[in-house]
């Protein structure tokens, strides 16, 4: 089973993915590291720009039929059995990305993406089996337990659990206005 864990930068994908893989006994794959290792895409500053079709082709060739948890904000474009879209309060995203040294423009871009569900919409356009999990105020263990519970119950689709439309005023300082 291929489980893709995706979401806006700063939601906790890597931490949750590694823990989920450990609890399931699956291999953990960082999509970014995989792309670099395979020579897919090119670095532009600190960012890796990849051709999504080439990435998905190579990933499917190398991992089809294997049990993996793959982490990356493009992982929802893969042919996965389940896509987990992690969400976090946009203010929290802004704080985390600012701490990581992201430019004001990049922080604003990602806060806005979280605010208007960009990754969730993309995931739903690409996949049937999508579950959305709000990580706000939860430990990585709590998030992983929620995901495992949904998997054990056979839940293949759960969306609409997050609505940030009421928090717009809180995140204005992070937006590119």
Curated annotation (Swiss-Prot):
GO biological process: ribosomal small subunit biogenesis; rRNA processing
Keywords from the named record: ATP-binding, Kinase, Nucleotide-binding, Ribosome biogenesis, rRNA processing, Transferase
Binding site for ATP: 10, 12-15, 100, 138
Catalytic function, reaction form: AMP + ATP = 2 ADP; ATP + H2O = ADP + phosphate + H(+)
Region: LID, residue numbers: 99-109
Ranges where the record places region NMP: 30-50
GO molecular function: adenylate kinase activity; ATP binding; ATP hydrolysis activity
EC number from the UniProt entry: 2.7.4.3
Enzyme class of the recorded protein, top EC level: transferase
Pfam annotation, one family: AAA_18
Family, per entry: Belongs to the adenylate kinase family. AK6 subfamily.
Assembly notes: Interacts with uS11. Not a structural component of 40S pre-ribosomes, but transiently interacts with them by binding to uS11.
Function comment: Broad-specificity nucleoside monophosphate (NMP) kinase that catalyzes the reversible transfer of the terminal phosphate group between nucleoside triphosphates and monophosphates. Also has ATPase activity. Involved in the late maturation steps of the 30S ribosomal particles, specifically 16S rRNA maturation. While NMP activity is not required for ribosome maturation, ATPase activity is. Associates transiently with small ribosomal subunit protein uS11. ATP hydrolysis breaks the interaction with uS11.
Protein name in UniProt: Putative adenylate kinase
């Amino acid at each position: 089973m291929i489980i893709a864990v995706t979401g806006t930068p700063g939601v906790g994908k890597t931490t949750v993915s590694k823990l989920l893989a450990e609890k399931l006994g699956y291999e953990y794959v960082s999509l970014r590291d995989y792309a670099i290792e395979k020579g897919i895409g090119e670095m532009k500053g600190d960012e890796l720009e990849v051709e999504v079709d080439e990435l998905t082709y190579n990933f499917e060739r190398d991992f089809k039929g294997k049990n993996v948890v793959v982490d990356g904000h493009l992982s929802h474009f893969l042919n996965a059995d389940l896509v987990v879209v992690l969400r976090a309060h946009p203010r929290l995203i802004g704080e985390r990305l600012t701490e990581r040294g992201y430019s004001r423009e990049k922080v604003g871009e990602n806060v806005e993406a979280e605010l208007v569900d960009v990754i969730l919409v993309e995931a739903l356009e690409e996949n049937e089996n999508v579950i959305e999990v709000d990580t706000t105020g939860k430990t990585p263990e709590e998030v992983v337990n929620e995901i495992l519970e949904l998997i054990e119950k056979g839940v293949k689709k759960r969306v609409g659990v997050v609505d940030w439309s009421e928090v717009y005023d809180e995140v204005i300082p992070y937006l590119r206005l």
